[in-house]
């Protein structure tokens, strides 16, 4: 039993020695490392590793999380508090959008400012020269993929900019 334990210790020390020789090759200079030297160099390496990673792996304690949450909550609630007429949430984008409708087919600059990172759902516009029947601003079920009406969801924009609709198409926005 003692032989097996010593064999395991010696095997582990030999593995540590070979690892340390690669890392501390300039300090070892081909001398035979004793067991105490191997252990000292191992401790030195682990401490240097901990010191180098200390700034990178800051683990917040349980006390920091609630205080950070409480610190950010007033700013969020101030940003999202009801407007002057208590009609809903006060948001810069919502205030700019209040004057318009939920469908937008005209100004591409407004579309890119109001929804820089939200995908738009394209729907066919009213037929040219015909009477305008009331349409639901919502696409039919399955309209996000491909349906019999030909409504397609646009591919996600790589630069988070809203794309301009094709002529004769309107954009439905949920706000």
Swiss-Prot record:
Residues 124-175 are annotated as: Disordered. A motif (WRPW motif) lies at residues 172-175. The keyword Nucleus applies. Keywords: DNA-binding, Nucleus, Repressor, Transcription, Transcription regulation. One of its GO terms (biological process) is midbrain-hindbrain boundary morphogenesis. Expressed exclusively in Purkinje cells. Residues 65-98 form the Orange domain. Pfam families: HLH. One of its GO terms (cellular component) is nucleus. Residues 1-49 form the bHLH domain. It is found in: Nucleus. Residues 124-145 have a biased composition (Low complexity). InterPro entries: bHLH_dom (IPR011598), HES_HEY (IPR050370), HLH_DNA-bd_sf (IPR036638), Orange_dom (IPR003650). GO terms for molecular function: DNA-binding transcription repressor activity, RNA polymerase II-specific; protein dimerization activity; RNA polymerase II cis-regulatory region sequence-specific DNA binding. Has a particular type of basic domain (presence of a helix-interrupting proline) that binds to the N-box (CACNAG), rather than the canonical E-box (CANNTG). The C-terminal WRPW motif is a transcriptional repression domain necessary for the interaction with Groucho/TLE family members, transcriptional corepressors recruited to specific target DNA by Hairy-related proteins. Transcription repression requires formation of a complex with a corepressor protein of the Groucho/TLE family. Transcriptional repressor of genes that require a bHLH protein for their transcription. This is Transcription factor HES-3. It comes from Rattus norvegicus (Rat). The lineage of its organism: Eukaryota, Metazoa, Chordata, Craniata, Vertebrata. The gene is Hes3.
């Amino acid at each position: 039993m003692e032989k097996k334990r010593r064999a395991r210790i010696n095997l582990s020390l030999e593995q540590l020695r070979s690892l340390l020789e690669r890392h501390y090759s300039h300090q070892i200079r081909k001398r035979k490392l004793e067991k105490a030297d191997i252990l000292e160099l191992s401790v030195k390496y682990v401490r240097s590793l901990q010191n180098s990673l200390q700034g990178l792996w800051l683990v917040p304690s349980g006390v920091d999380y609630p205080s950070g949450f409480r610190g950010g909550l007033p700013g969020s609630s101030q940003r999202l508090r009801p407007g002057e007429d208590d009609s809903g949430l006060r948001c810069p984008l919502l205030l700019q959008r209040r004057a318009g409708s939920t469908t937008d087919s005209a100004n591409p600059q407004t579309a890119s400012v109001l929804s820089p990172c939200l995908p738009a759902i394209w729907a066919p516009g009213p037929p040219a020269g015909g009477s305008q029947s009331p349409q639901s601003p919502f696409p039919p079920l399955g309209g996000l993929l491909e349906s019999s009406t030909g409504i397609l969801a646009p591919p996600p924009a790589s630069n988070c900019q809203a794309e301009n609709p094709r002529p004769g198409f309107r954009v439905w926005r949920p706000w």
